[in-house]
C-alpha cells in the first residue's frame, strides 16, 4: 500500500529547513581540522520546539561539543498574498556548547550566538533563499541555569521574526536523517536506569 500524500499548508517545516540551510555555511565546522574550530559547531539542525531544558541535553550532546537547533515557536501573523499563504514566523536558534580545547562553554556559546545573529543580518544574504523578508527584531538571550551548568553545557538563544511562505511542500530530501537517538528506560522503581546512545545504519545505496 502506498503512503498517502500529506498536505503542508500552514506548515513552518519548509521555512525552518530553509533557515537551517542558510546558516550551515556560517556555523558548521567542516573539512580537515574541523575538530579544532572552536567558534563553530558540528551540526545545525531543525528542532521541534523550545530547547532550554537540561533533560534534553543528553540526547543532543551525544558525541558532540556543541550544536545549533532551529525551531519555529509561533506564527503571530498570517495572511494570503495572492494564492500564497505567508506567515510572520518567530524563530529561535538554540546554541549549546561544552568546553572545548580549554575554552569555556559560556564564551563559546555567546561567540557563536553572535556569529549567528550577524549571519542573519547580512545585507542581501536572503535573496533567493525562499524567505519573503530579511529577519527583523533579532535578539540574543543567555539561557544559563544551574541544571544545564551541571550538565557541562551553556545555552544561548537567538530569536527573530521573518516572513516565509507557509504552503511550500516539504521536501523529504531536506529533512534530517534519523540516524541516532538516545534511549532511556526505568525498569522498576529504584532500579538502575538503562541509558544508551544508539546509532542506526544509514540508508541503503
Give short role names for the model-derived ranges.
Residues 1-81, 183-205:
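Small/polar-rich, solvent-exposed N-terminal microdomains that initiate assembly or binding
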Residues 78-81, 98-104, 165-171:
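Short, cysteine-centered beta-strand-loop-beta hairpins and adjacent loop/turn segments enriched
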Residues 11, 83-88, 96-124:
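Extracellular/virion structural assembly segments
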Residues 85-100, 152-166:
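Oligomerization/assembly interface segments of phage tail-like spikes and tubes
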Residues 155-205:
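C-terminal tail/extension regions appended to the core domain(s) of diverse proteins
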Residues 99-107, 122-128, 188-200:
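Short C-terminal domain-edge/linker segments immediately following a structured domain
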Residues 60-62, 78-86, 147-153:
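Short, solvent-exposed beta-strand/turn "edge" segments of beta-rich domains on protein surfaces
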Residues 64, 106-171:
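Acidic-leaning, charged glycine-interspersed low-complexity segments
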Amino acid at each position: 500500500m502506498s503512503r498517502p500524500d500529506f498536505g503542508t499548508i500552514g506548515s513552518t517545516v519548509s521555512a525552518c529547513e530553509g533557515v537551517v540551510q542558510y546558516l550551515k555555511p556560517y556555523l558548521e565546522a567542516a573539512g580537515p581540522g574541523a575538530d579544532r574550530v572552536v567558534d563553530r559547531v558540528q551540526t545545525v539542525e531543525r528542532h521541534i520546539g523550545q530547547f532550554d531544558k537540561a533533560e534534553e541535553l543528553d540526547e543532543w550532546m551525544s558525541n558532540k561539543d556543541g550544536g545549533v537547533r532551529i525551531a519555529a515557536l509561533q506564527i503571530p501573523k498570517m495572511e494570503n498574498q495572492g494564492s500564497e499563504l505567508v506567515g510572520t514566523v518567530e524563530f529561535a536558534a538554540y546554541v549549546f556548547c561544552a568546553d572545548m580545547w580549554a575554552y569555556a562553554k559560556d564564551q563559546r556559546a555567546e561567540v557563536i550566538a553572535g556569529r549567528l545573529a550577524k549571519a542573519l543580518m547580512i545585507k542581501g544574504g536572503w535573496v533567493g533563499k525562499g524567505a519573503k523578508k530579511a529577519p527583523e527584531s533579532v535578539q540574543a538571550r543567555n539561557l544559563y541555569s544551574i541544571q544545564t551548568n551541571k550538565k557541562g553545557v551553556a545555552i544561548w538563544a537567538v530569536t527573530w521574526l521573518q516572513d516565509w511562505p507557509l504552503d511550500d511542500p516539504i521536501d523529504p530530501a531536506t529533512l534530517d536523517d534519523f540516524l541516532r537517538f538516545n534511549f532511556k528506560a526505568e525498569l522498576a522503581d529504584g532500579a538502575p536506569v538503562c541509558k544508551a546512545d544508539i546509532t542506526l545504519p544509514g540508508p541503503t545505496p
